[in-house]
Swiss-Prot record:
Name of the protein in question: Mitogen-activated protein kinase kinase kinase 1
Self-association state and partner proteins as the record states: Binds both upstream activators and downstream substrates in multimolecular complexes through its N-terminus. Oligomerizes after binding MAP4K2 or TRAF2. Interacts with AXIN1. Interacts (via the kinase catalytic domain) with STK38. Interacts with GRIPAP1.
Cofactor(s) the protein needs: Mg(2+)
Function: Component of a protein kinase signal transduction cascade. Activates the ERK and JNK kinase pathways by phosphorylation of MAP2K1 and MAP2K4. May phosphorylate the MAPK8/JNK1 kinase. Activates CHUK and IKBKB, the central protein kinases of the NF-kappa-B pathway.
Organism: Mus musculus (Mouse)
GO CC annotation, single: cytosol
Entry's family note: Belongs to the protein kinase superfamily. STE Ser/Thr protein kinase family. MAP kinase kinase kinase subfamily.
Residue positions of the active site: D1350 (proton acceptor)
Regulation: Activated by autophosphorylation on Thr-1381 and Thr-1393 following oligomerization.
InterPro entries assigned: ARM-like, ARM-type_fold, Kinase-like_dom_sf, Prot_kinase_dom, Protein_kinase_ATP_BS, Ser/Thr_kinase_AS, Znf_RING, Znf_RING/FYVE/PHD
Effect on the protein of changing G1404A: Loss of AP-1 and NF-kappa-B transcription factor activity
Keyword Endoplasmic reticulum: no
Amino acid sequence: MAAAAGDRASSSGFPGAAAASPEAGGGGGGGGALQGSGAPAAGAAGLLREPGSAGRERADWRRRQLRKVRSVELDQLPEQPLFLAAASPPCPSTSPSPEPADAAAGASRFQPAAGPPPPGAASRCGSHSAELAAARDSGARSPAGAEPPSAAAPSGREMENKETLKGLHKMEDRPEERMIREKLKATCMPAWKHEWLERRNRRGPVVVKPIPIKGDGSEVNNLAAEPQGEGQAGSAAPAPKGRRSPSPGSSPSGRSVKPESPGVRRKRVSPVPFQSGRITPPRRAPSPDGFSPYSPEETSRRVNKVMRARLYLLQQIGPNSFLIGGDSPDNKYRVFIGPQNCSCGRGAFCIHLLFVMLRVFQLEPSDPMLWRKTLKNFEVESLFQKYHSRRSSRIKAPSRNTIQKFVSRMSNSHTLSSSSTSTSSSENSIKDEEEQMCPICLLGMLDEESLTVCEDGCRNKLHHHCMSIWAEECRRNREPLICPLCRSKWRSHDFYSHELSSPVESPASLRAVQQPSSPQQPVAGSQRRNQESSFNLTHFGTQQIPSAYKDLAEPWIQVFGMELVGCLFSRNWNVREMALRRLSHDVSGALLLANGESTGNSGGGSGGSLSAGAASGSSQPSISGDVVEACCSVLSIVCADPVYKVYVAALKTLRAMLVYTPCHSLAERIKLQRLLRPVVDTILVKCADANSRTSQLSISTVLELCKGQAGELAVGREILKAGSIGVGGVDYVLSCILGNQAESNNWQELLGRLCLIDRLLLEFPAEFYPHIVSTDVSQAEPVEIRYKKLLSLLTFALQSIDNSHSMVGKLSRRIYLSSARMVTAVPAVFSKLVTMLNASGSTHFTRMRRRLMAIADEVEIAEVIQLGVEDTVDGHQDSLQAVAPTSCLENSSLEHTVHREKTGKGLSATRLSASSEDISDRLAGVSVGLPSSTTTEQPKPAVQTKGRPHSQCLNSSPLSHAQLMFPAPSAPCSSAPSVPDISKHRPQAFVPCKIPSASPQTQRKFSLQFQRNCSEHRDSDQLSPVFTQSRPPPSSNIHRPKPSRPVPGSTSKLGDATKSSMTLDLGSASRCDDSFGGGGNSGNAVIPSDETVFTPVEDKCRLDVNTELNSSIEDLLEASMPSSDTTVTFKSEVAVLSPEKAENDDTYKDDVNHNQKCKEKMEAEEEEALAIAMAMSASQDALPIVPQLQVENGEDIIIIQQDTPETLPGHTKAKQPYREDAEWLKGQQIGLGAFSSCYQAQDVGTGTLMAVKQVTYVRNTSSEQEEVVEALREEIRMMGHLNHPNIIRMLGATCEKSNYNLFIEWMAGGSVAHLLSKYGAFKESVVINYTEQLLRGLSYLHENQIIHRDVKGANLLIDSTGQRLRIADFGAAARLASKGTGAGEFQGQLLGTIAFMAPEVLRGQQYGRSCDVWSVGCAIIEMACAKPPWNAEKHSNHLALIFKIASATTAPSIPSHLSPGLRDVAVRCLELQPQDRPPSRELLKHPVFRTTW
């Protein structure tokens, strides 16, 4: 029979069915062995028996099915069915009675599913039992080996359903068999099981908890021995759904399950349906995932990192959220448990989330909840319950508190720490372990650490460092300092000195800094404590100094302390910036104090030596010398910091050091120059920084150093009567540039120096160009020295022309060519440049020489160069020997002039006149005079040059040049008194221009500047600013806007204007004029000539000569001369100008006015639109008056009726009764809340229709009742003061019996939500109208520091016309703590309808006015769709909706049918970040509201 059954299974069409089916897996007696040993023989036997025994087999099959049904109803035998086949003697294949065979077959049906047989099976039975076991092995092996997984999966799914019949065969798809199977399932399975199975099948494979097993594989024996039926056996027996059955050769522990991460335990989720006849519901499944996404090594590394991280638990800011802080008070992160995310934005499993899970919740690293992406509600609740129980257990310790209070009275803090430790050691180990953990950083506390104690409260110990961070958090929130555990007031005031104190207020900290000669520990400790009191670096902790810098930092530590120096090496740039701020404070204070003691000759501890030093005019090397030396060493390192704010802080420290450092002697200057040299070298590298702000600031810093005592970095500038001589100005900077010759492969150093050289030549031309004459002859350097300076810089640039870095080579070539163009006034110098180029052997020699000769052709000195250098050297020497006359300077209207003569071919022919057409053709962009400052720290005089013609773009086309001409008025010699008026506006520097063309912004600025200048100093019809610039050829690569060429008429006016007298320096006939002029005169000459064209430039301007050398070098870095609109300067970033030193920059104002005309026009239109909107809403109907509800001025608006008990003081007693059902009647109910109801009402005396809101204030406890009464009073008084057309108005309020009655005006149209439910979604015009009125009302509320917090359709009421909207229901409204947007007291409160609430409110974060703006966007969606946002009507669980909104990364979907304007308003309102949402007043300026007027 068994053979026949197996035969039928064999013929089913499944591959390997004889082995996979239960009958084939082990039949009765020899039949099973026969089938297990050879499938062909079994198939042959089946074919022989099939025709004659079909009817008998069908009857036997039915009997077996009925027997199985009965076996399900009764508890099955625990042990006998499993081992019946092994214990019974071998029986023949044709057994006379079917029961033993059926029992054996039934037993064999469990074996393939249960996995491999126990190892002791062969020993418990004879040889034939061993054969049966082998047969079963072969039958179980075939599905795993020969059969593919897809074929085995259906069988596994059928056998996995443990609630089905144990002996149910794997039947085929015959109709009658399928029908019987469904009936059996329906009769034997409860309804809840059906549902649970369907859910499990939809969910996919489940994770089964592995059963603990022994090495000998004895768990199968235990399963067989325990009478647990299908519950335990079924968990191990069926293979997981969709997975392959285990191979029998493997150990029992080798079941096919998903690999786990080390140490992660699995929770069993499969239920136990039948256990002792009981049916139990399924257990709740835990959250999915639970596996670490990292390798075991990476997982261990991350866990260890979290356990060492300097993070701090600041507070629980919401139901399921924490605020986590770092060492810096600005680093705060919000961690949300459940969604498992953090505000840091670093993705899943960030260090802050792991900190909460491992240290706050104290999970084990092997806990599966640690690595789950989401947690279920019950898991979150369990974590928080354990957390709160741990915290409360630390607070409730009265006996220990009592003991330690006595101890604290009798001992100092050290004794207190030891006594508390000894007391806690007597308690149980778990609590003791809890007591020894700091509640802020959640790490253990050691006796050697600095600890503090909550003296008035819970008596818990905390780290001193952690408590300082908590104190800073309290200070920033403007809250009193309390214990983070018990919330009691903190007695100690050690943590509240956070304000920065001035040097006068805290001289002790300065003296501590000034004593490096005694580095004993007590001094260092007191020094650090004093520094903490001023700048509070304590919450940054002790930072580790890298080993490579320990030797370098050792002298720093001796001067400034370990804490400050350690913070300079912090990985957090905020910490480094704060450390530099404190360093600046300490250095300036130390230098100021030392200078004050020395200059004042005061006595004291070291007064003798300081006074002696002061008498000799030198600074104190014992005090200020070490401070300056250590500070310069620090700055040479920190100035290389890549963070811009840290770099700015370093430059501020440099300025603070220099302005308080006196320098009186040459020896002090040399020492200061030596100390500053590494700092300047570091800044020079920054001059070529990729960040344009950094490069601009670096160049501006060095330029301030070049200005010497006239700049912001003047030595001893802030010291009264210092008389410092400075560090050398331009000469010192030149020594820094040329002293350390940068290696050719270090392109950053080369490029930084070249960028600075480019600016130096433009900013200080009088320092380098021999032909520029200074007015201050006594302070001016000889022209030979300037000539040597220029040649040294050009030699440096020439060395880098062939540099492999393209930008270095281009900038070098540009500097060389631009300098050559500037020295065309002195042909000898120009010839020297040509000679230097010839000797360089550059690969660019041919091209560079061609350009130099083209420049010579333009100014007509080419023949001089061709005649030879010898003919011009003598003339050049004569030119250098000439002294600028002083008489002409005294009579000149300008401070000095630059003269050049126009030379003929032999330098002998000189023309004294020229036509205006010739002048216009020969105007040059270099003819610009600019102010500067000398090396001797005096401001440089202005410069006058005469125009000269030249081609700016030296390519094949001679017309491809651009000329920039700035005309200016010429003043007669009698106008000399105007000189002080001009010079008084001037800054310290003059900026001649960069050789590439000026940017359009610069041109516009100069245009405005010269318009103003001309209007002040001349008649408006004489001159006009003219830009002369021709377009480049089409082949040029330069794409810049070019102004148009002036007409000849304007140029002739310019020539006429220059006929007045001017002063020229005509020292020698051999000196060349710019382009034309008188050549034979010597000495001073006043030449009123037509051809004399010059350009005096107002002192404050910064010019760009529009000179384009070639397209190949024109595309250079713009960083060397930034545009005026985005320029970053030392003054704007570092220096703080005092009011008396601040200068009025009218040019800047004009430029701003020019740039903002369009913006101001738009803003004016928007303000006008806003004014119209407010005016339209200003008028409203008069509010009906109810006599009994009127109160006099100064009285409380709430009127207490006579029958109300006198338990509510502060209200107005009723002069006339106004009681329900007497003076007013209550109508139908129109609203219902948790503690309030809203009704229609009528005043009996006047017939006025009203809406009355009745709120009961009676609560269970007196404290709760007081809170309710106070909230109601606040709402009523708030509404009593509001008066706006879009805010609901209140007629009055009474207190009667146990209710407050709020009488508000009747809005017959009902709420927006009511209209939407009745009439459907609004048209867009209606939505716009209502939205505008809503924004008007909110703008009024926000201006009165009120946030509504419950804006939704149900709280927006419409009048009887449908045109007026009013905001109602201020039960959730609150007054802001201040006029600021943020209000800390509102965090954690969940008020209002969830679907309309902003995400930050649901997350428990701080919120303000912007939460109402978010609700406006939600109201737009509701009015446009007639349903709330987020599909809220589909969420029956409000917690699920809260989670959805709080964890949303996108705004709710906006209806697609909205117009772009209204859609833009909704998008602006629904910005996820509160700071990105515009205020309601700004939204009223949107064009969508203006188009409807």
